[in-house]
Amino acid sequence: MKIKQAIDKIPGGLMLVPLFLGALCNTFTPGAGKYLGSFSNGLITGTIPILAVWFFCMGASIELKATGTMLKKSGVLVITKLATAWVVALIAGTFLPGDGIQNGLLAGISVLALVAAMDMTNGGLYAALMNQYGSKEEAGAFVLMSLESGPLMTMVILGASGIATFEPQLFVGAVLPFLIGFTLGNLDPDLRKLFGNSVQTLIPFFAFALGNTINLAVILQTGFAGIFLGVLVIVVTGIPLIIADKFIGGGNGTAGVAASSSAGAAVATPLLIANMAPEFAPVAQQATALVATSVIVTSVLVPVITALWAKRFSPKHA
């Protein structure tokens, strides 16, 4: 059976299929983890420890070697994406209630959902698109985008916008596994290869555990809002990214369009933030479902828009 091949045909499938299976388990057999106990309970409820290992391996996979062009391009895109998410947090924090929108088609939209969906780029999607429509240096910019992975930047944005307060040690705890992995990976190429190969492997495991925190009813309730959020991510982050790429990064805007997506890893952010800041716990489940939908929407639309943009503005693809 070509199970992996079938999963790969679904945008973000490696993350979203196990997430959906976990949500199925949580909806119809919510006590399975406690009932089975032992290793099965660990797989079902182990989101945080599995993610900790994943962040460590992600850090180990990043090589501290890049050209000036690559650093300039990636720096411009990453800073623009984070700055945009911060502005959105400031605006949303002013107008949205603390527990998010409760009624209507946009029920579930909260500051946490908006920031989590917007502050992290799908690096793999970006690299694939820029390999096709850009230069090798532009494609290589995804390396710095890996620094967005995890809850750290979301914590910084929520803290800087005055929406949440985090104890200093929580910032250290959020980034420490990543930094240890990064250090070891750059000290020894063999360790980088060993741990770096585990990044993709661990995704289905933390996705399944994460899915076990979601009820399918929540996914159905937030369907339209999730689609809206995905489109909003492309428009709200895409426009500043295009402008920054053209006028600061020296590109033609294609890289900006390619970076206007939600990363699969962002699906885990609401739960991680709620684990450190309990005031977000009431909106975490809905935010997780919304971000998951946003990942699908941006994974489908961003490649299409990037291709159209490159055809219109890139000489070699005109």
From Swiss-Prot:
Major subcellular site: membrane
GO cellular component: a single term: plasma membrane
Which superkingdom is the protein from?
Answer: Bacteria
One Gene Ontology term of the molecular function aspect: 2-keto-3-deoxygluconate:proton symporter activity
Q: Which cysteines are joined by disulfide bonds?
A: none
Which reactions are catalysed by this chain? 2-dehydro-3-deoxy-D-gluconate(in) + H(+)(in) = 2-dehydro-3-deoxy-D-gluconate(out) + H(+)(out)
Transmembrane helix is among the record's keywords:
yes
Q: Where in the cell is it found?
A: Cell inner membrane
Which keywords fit this entry according to its UniProt record? Cell inner membrane, Cell membrane, Membrane, Sugar transport, Symport, Transmembrane, Transmembrane helix, Transport
Which chain regions cross the lipid bilayer?
10-30, 42-62, 76-96, 105-125, 139-159, 162-182, 199-219, 224-244, 263-283, 289-309
Q: What does this protein do?
A: Catalyzes the proton-dependent uptake of 2-keto-3-deoxygluconate (KDG) into the cell.
Would you identify the family this protein belongs to, as annotated?
Answer: Belongs to the KdgT transporter family.
Q: Which NCBIfam families match?
A: kdgT (TIGR00793)
Name this protein carries in UniProt: 2-keto-3-deoxygluconate permease
Native source species: Pectobacterium carotovorum subsp. carotovorum (strain PC1)
Give the gene symbol: kdgT
